[in-house]
């Protein structure tokens, strides 16, 4: 492992944001671009699709591999 002292990061124990930065950062959750939300929804929809030939009652598996 190579150590690069110029890449070291100081971690402060103070809560973030501190008093100096309070006016610069929005309160609450940061806004998320609509493109990210749309992509996340597409991934969720694709993950919820059941494969063809499978039953929802059992775990999805490859239906064309049969033991002989």
Curated annotation (Swiss-Prot):
Sequence ranges of Polar residues compositional bias: 44-54
A single cellular component GO annotation: cytoplasm
Biological process annotations from GO: axon regeneration; regulation of neuron differentiation; regulation of transforming growth factor beta receptor signaling pathway
Region annotated Disordered, chain positions: 21-54
Domain of life: Eukaryota
Annotated compartments: Cytoplasm
Post-translational modification: Phosphorylated on Ser-59. Phosphorylation decreases stability and activity.
Entry's transmembrane regions: none
Assigned keywords, A-Z: Cytoplasm, Phosphoprotein
Entry keyword tRNA processing: no
Main location (coarse class): cytoplasm
A Pfam family of this chain: Alveol-reg_P311
Function description: May have roles in neural function and cellular differentiation. Ectopic expression promotes axonal regeneration, induces differentiation of fibroblast into myofibroblast, induces myofibroblast ameboid migration, augments motility of gliomas, and increases retinoic-acid regulation of lipid-droplet biogenesis. Down-regulates the expression of TGFB1 and TGFB2 but not of TGFB3. May play a role in the regulation of alveolar generation.
Subunit structure: Interacts with the latency-associated peptides (LAP) of TGFB1 and TGFB2; the interaction results in a decrease in TGFB autoinduction. Interacts with FLNA.
Protein name as annotated: Neuronal regeneration-related protein
Species for this entry: Pongo abelii
């Amino acid at each position: 492992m190579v150590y690069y002292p110029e890449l070291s990061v100081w971690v402060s124990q103070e809560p973030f944001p501190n008093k100096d930065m309070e006016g610069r950062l929005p309160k609450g959750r940061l806004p998320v671009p609509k493109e990210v939300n749309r992509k996340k929804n597409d991934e969720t929809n694709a993950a919820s699709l059941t494969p063809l030939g499978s039953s929802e009652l059992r775990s999805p598996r490859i239906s064309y591999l049969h033991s002989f």
